[in-house]
Amino acid sequence: MINVFQQPPQGIQTAPHEPRILAAGHQVAVREVDLEGVADKEGLMLAFLRGLGLTDHFGRNWDALYDVLTDPDARPVRFALVLRDYGHFQARHKQLGPQLQQVLLGAQAEAAARGRSLWLLAEEPDHDTRHW
């Protein structure tokens, strides 16, 4: 199996097993955003605030999220974002899902244009805890 970090970032990819260990060997910084309990846009922005270690000054909107993901002073040159429960989030949120994807892919393209790498790694929980 090819290590995801041996290739340039290519959209939203399935997270490898033990992404932090693999990333460390390739000098890639990793942060994790847990989308499992997100119910609305405010919850989504709070998940990114926590996952990225942002301050309360984070604007909690799409433009602010794009800006923090593309800020060369705030993000390392080689950076991976692990999106926990991404597939389930997309299935649950028919409007928020595509909006988030657009911001993430736009930030990834901007990073690449600046000679930087932003991996977007979708990771699903090991067990199904959803209650319908």
Question: What are these model-predicted stretches?
Answer:
Residues 1-132:
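Positively charged, polar, low-complexity stretches
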